[in-house]
A protein has these predicted regions:
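Transmembrane beta-strands of outer-membrane beta-barrel pores
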Residues: 14-20, 57-65, 102-110, 135, ...
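Outer-envelope beta-barrel architecture signal
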Residues: 4-10, 47-55, 92-100, 140-148
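Extracellular loop and loop/strand-boundary signature of outer-membrane beta-barrel proteins
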Residues: 20-28, 63-72, 114-120, 181-184
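Short glycine/proline- and aromatic-enriched beta-strand/turn motifs that initiate or cap beta-hairpins
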Residues: 1-64
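Residues on the lipid-exposed face of transmembrane beta-strands in outer-membrane beta-barrel proteins
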Residues: 36-44, 80-86, 100, 127-135, ...
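Outer-membrane beta-barrel transmembrane domain signature
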Residues: 116-185
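Residues that define the transmembrane beta-barrel architecture of outer-membrane proteins
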Residues: 28-36, 51, 72-80, 94, ...
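Hydrophobic/aromatic-rich structural module bridging two neighboring secondary-structure elements via a short loop
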Residues: 61-108, 119
Length: 185
């Protein structure tokens, strides 16, 4: 029997956001960002010595305000990401991982001051590359892992309506510039 240990991480992120949603407003909004995230990484069944898979999921809440400070947006986003990573043991305690990933982000931004378009849907699908470096060490008798990771979307699709374009127009068939395809070029 081959051991397939799993690493589970729960993280709480807090910080700042600088956002622009041109469907709701032509202005940049700055403010608070909160996220709770979950990650599970485990050695794969087919080759546990060299391959791992990673699943990440999270829930984000942003509450930025406009430059005048008299209006704020409320954004809720859920995301999920799956990656298959090849693992190389470079040195004692140091491993490098590289592979492909796919992901989804979906949510809504609400602007309480707008009368016609009060919310903006956020839908993104992507595929890309992922990399990670992990170093295991002991701090006294406590085992620790320091890790750096990056995900780079390569290709994707997203829903992005134009400023002041109503959902009624889209319902009638005017999808101009609402569903977009993105890639490196």
């Amino acid at each position: 029997t081959v051991l397939r240990p799993a690493t589970v991480t729960v993280a709480i992120d807090a910080g700042a956001t600088h956002s622009l949603d041109t469907y709701l407003s032509p202005l940049f909004y700055d403010g608070m960002h909160l996220r709770i995230g979950f990650e599970r990484q485990r050695a794969s069944r087919f080759n546990p010595e060299r391959w791992t898979h990673k699943i990440e999921a999270g829930l984000t809440y942003d509450n930025p305000s406009n430059p005048a400070g008299n209006n704020s947006l409320h954004t809720i986003i859920a995301d999920v990401d799956f990656a298959m990573l090849h693992r190389w043991r470079v040195a004692q305690g140091l491993t490098l991982h590289a592979g492909a990933d796919i992901g989804f982000r979906g949510g809504v931004t609400y602007n309480p001051r707008n009368s016609n378009n009060v919310c903006s849907p956020l839908i993104r699908l992507y595929a890309g590359a992922s990399g990670m470096a992990a170093y295991r060490f002991n701090a006294g008798r406590l085992p620790m892992t320091a890790r750096w990771q990056a995900t780079l979307p390569v290709v994707g699709g997203f829903f992005l309506p134009d400023y002041d374009q109503s959902f009624y127009e889209m319902y009638l068939g005017n999808y101009r510039n609402t569903i977009n395809f993105g890639f490196w070029h």
